[in-house]
UniProtKB/Swiss-Prot annotation:
It comes from Mycobacterium marinum (strain ATCC BAA-535 / M). The lineage of its organism: Bacteria, Bacillati, Actinomycetota, Actinomycetes, Mycobacteriales. This is Arginine deiminase. The active site is at residue 391. Keywords: Arginine metabolism, Cytoplasm, Hydrolase. InterPro entries: Arg_deiminase.
Length: 402
């Protein structure tokens, strides 16, 4: 099983992917907490589930094995060590106080794997605390409203791209930047450490300090990795990842790509994704301004070159004459709307074959005009968290590119 897993590109034929079907965690969203939980609206959950099921079925119809995060987590939680790890990550004694934290931890450790998996993903309100956890000595319990969260939900689990990254035959457990998402990495950590499917797989990098998120990491070609630096991934995170990849011989060149620190461009893959071995789709407004610092491995360390145009730096690192840009060079208003709706956030199933949201009609038409096969899915509800097909998928295995 170990030899089947791994990826060295964005476009090698996709074999295995991790998705998360949206569930109760989305039903926890209210007008009061959407900003805190990083959603731009209240999704119609049953419709979001239908759209996600369509996405998963499309992948299966193309021969992709779809692994669901909640099922992997439930299976991993049969391990006692996994249960301890999950409970420790979910129960914050600094926020809950020692008495409640102790009572809650004991209760959670007694849950069966299915129920514990549900709580770790969907969270728990004070109203859902069992009677024997409502200790009379807990001021925290007495002062909180019943609908407040004792364990916060993880609605952004939908975007499995960010909480783990496969580079070569190894995986990365990153540190997520936003408080609402920090605990997601603990769940992927549990899965990779305790699920038998991943026995023997080695980590490439792990950071609990400098943030790196999977949406900022593009595998441009074997040995060449681009890392967006902006709202989520920091320069320190990008540099630490680069040095780790060099040490493990997983890359020879890393491009650090500054992006605007704004919600619409939170990750590099919101403005640019690979659609073929030498083609990218890119938001028109950044084509001329996107740059990259080239970090290269050397026998005695690394060298960091001055910023150069991203497309030129990428082509040079990839060893190709030109990286073709399929721009959303349409009406500026339409281009901005479709970028906001994740028009540039495509998932490649094979060279020249991508999945995209159907609503981004003009971007999709430009891709098709450039010879790309575009497979569309609905995304009216899935998109309320600002993520597209690439964001919603963590490729675990692709056919390697030479």
């Amino acid at each position: 099983m170990v030899d089947e897993l791994g990826s060295n590109s964005e476009v090698g034929t996709l074999k295995v992917v991790i998705l998360h079907r949206p569930g109760t965690e989305l039903r926890r969203l209210t007008p009061r907490n959407t900003d805190q939980l990083l959603f731009d609206g209240l999704p119609w959950v049953s419709r979001a589930q239908e759209e996600h099921d369509q996405f998963a079925e499309l992948l299966r119809s193309r021969g992709v094995e779809v692994l669901l995060l909640s099922e992997l987590l439930t299976e991993a939680l049969h391990s006692g060590a996994a249960r301890m790890q999950g409970v420790a990550a979910a129960v914050d004694s600094r926020r809950l106080g020692i008495p409640l934290a102790q009572e809650l931890s004991a209760y959670l450790r007694g849950l069966d794997p299915v129920r514990l998996s549900h709580v770790l993903t969907a969270g728990m309100t004070f109203n859902e605390l069992p009677a024997d956890a409502r200790t009379d000595v807990s001021l925290v319990v007495r002062m909180h409203h019943d609908a407040d969260f004792v364990i916060e939900p993880l609605p952004n689990l939908l975007f499995t791209r960010d909480s783990s990254i496969w580079i070569g035959p190894r995986f990365v457990i990153p540190s997520l930047a936003m408080r609402a998402r920090v605990r997601e990495a603990s769940l992927t950590d549990i899965i990779y450490a305790h699920h038998p499917r991943f026995t023997g797989i080695r980590r490439a990098y792990e950071s609990r300090t400098a943030p790196v998120e999977g949406g900022d990491v593009l595998l441009l070609a074997p040995g060449v990795v681009a890392v967006g630096v902006g709202e989520r991934t920091t320069p320190a995170g990008a540099e630490a990842l680069a040095r780790s990849l060099f040490d493990d011989d997983l890359a020879h060149t890393v491009l650090a790509v500054p992006i605007a620190q704004r919600r619409a461009q939170m990750h590099l893959d919101t403005v640019c994704t690979m659609v073929d071995v030498d083609k990218v789709v890119m938001y028109a407004n950044v084509v001329d301004e996107l740059t990259a610092f080239t970090i290269e491995r050397q026998p005695d360390g690394v060298t960091i070159s001055d910023a150069a145009p991203f497309v030129e730096a990428a082509a040079r690192a990839m060893g190709i004459e030109k990286l073709q840009v399929i721009g959303t060079g349409i009406d500026p208003v339409v281009a901005e709307r479709e970028q906001w709706d994740d028009g540039n956030n495509t998932l490649a199933l094979a060279p020249g074959v991508v999945v995209a949201y159907e609503r981004n009609a003009q971007t999709n038409a430009r891709l098709e005009a450039a010879g790309i096969e575009v497979l569309t899915i609905g995304g009216s509800e899935l998109g309320t968290g600002r993520g597209g097909p690439r964001c919603m998928s963590c490729p675990v295995a692709r056919d390697p590119l030479p």
